[in-house]
Swiss-Prot record:
Protein name: Anhydro-N-acetylmuramic acid kinase
Example GO BP: peptidoglycan turnover
Pfam family, one: AnmK
Any one GO MF annotation of this record: phosphotransferase activity, alcohol group as acceptor
Described function: Catalyzes the specific phosphorylation of 1,6-anhydro-N-acetylmuramic acid (anhMurNAc) with the simultaneous cleavage of the 1,6-anhydro ring, generating MurNAc-6-P. Is required for the utilization of anhMurNAc either imported from the medium or derived from its own cell wall murein, and thus plays a role in cell wall recycling.
Gene field: anmK
Catalytic activity from the UniProt record: 1,6-anhydro-N-acetyl-beta-muramate + ATP + H2O = N-acetyl-D-muramate 6-phosphate + ADP + H(+)
Residues noted as binding ATP in the record, renumbered to the chain: G9, T10, S11, H12, D13, G14, I15, D16
Superkingdom, taxonomy of origin: Bacteria
Natural source organism: Beutenbergia cavernae (strain ATCC BAA-8 / DSM 12333 / CCUG 43141 / JCM 11478 / NBRC 16432 / NCIMB 13614 / HKI 0122)
Keyword Hydrolase: no
EC number: 2.7.1.170
Family classification: Belongs to the anhydro-N-acetylmuramic acid kinase family.
Amino acid sequence: MRVLGMISGTSHDGIDVAVVRFTLDAGGAQLRGVVEHATTVPYPTALRARVAGALPPAQVGMAEVCALDADLGHAFADAAAEAAAAPDVPEPPDLVCSHGQTMYHWVAEGSALGTLQLGSPAWIAERLGVPVVADVRIRDVTAGGQGAPLVPLLDELLLAGASGRTAVLNLGGIANVTVVGDGADPVAYDVGPANALIDAAVAAAGRGAYDADGALAAAGRVHAPLLDALLTEPYYARRPPKSTGKELFDPGYVDRVRRGAGGAAAADLSLEDLVSTLTELTARVVAQDVRRLDVARLVVSGGGVRNPVLLGALTAAVPGVEVVPSDAFGVSVDHKEAVAFALLGWFTAHGLPASVPSATGASGARVLGSVTPGAGPLRLPTPLSTAPSRLRLTS
């Protein structure tokens, strides 16, 4: 079965797409996946600005919510059609799994109460003529879970059989980690900001969308009073399962912390010093959790891996831990989440639960998503009674 997975993450800079051909080995214990195509399609500048302008704490009307749902749906449909027609995809996909764009993740007093992803899947189904799995988080929320993270499904299967305890870290807008190994159930949660605050600072200064190659951080110095104030964030001390996003770490977050702390923390800083401080914040927060988790290996992915200052600071802060890119396990650091959603779509199509309760806190595993039919009658594979226990990926 060929599945096209799609997601736009908390950096809301574009759509990650992966086309994966899955084959189940005889006996059903091992699933093999060939990543035939993987790419990132940037959002048009105007659409990205509208997404950013609608994120918390902004107040937007329902007309704009409706328009964004349609326009994001068109953007996802365009990206899917482009990937389906790529020369390295020999046949059209049988299924699409689209995460869409998270606009709001409703968490109150540590409990997830709702979640909203825009990008109507009907536009994708109409464009490609195949079924589309979407709205994948809410089923876990209704079961008492956080609705996040969902990537532990991929992490658990991909690292099945690996020796020792391994932490799998994604450095997107938000940093999230999965811990697998030693025969225990996976543990996974959102750690805190990865690129979100850095990107917001760079964008606010009109210097682009992100700190390219960590150049701004490298040119600055860490401002200790501000860093100390930022490290007092209560979220970091909360025990998992937990999830967060730009509902907390929004573009105004740093200014609120500075005003609240006063004194030296509120001093005017150069952009370079601010970005250096925020980069150190991400490295410090992630590293303290990695040390606490007592792992031998850290597998990294996401846009933050392309920032040598961030990755260097993180690596230096976890001596004795082997830091390796996810490429070593057959999945690109840039497209791991798209591959994960292709896998999630395969699970849903076969009637298999894809949530990991030990990661999300749900009362049990659930089959995720809603299915929008394609051009003809909805025909899904015969449901499987047992899920595969391992995944091997190649490209």
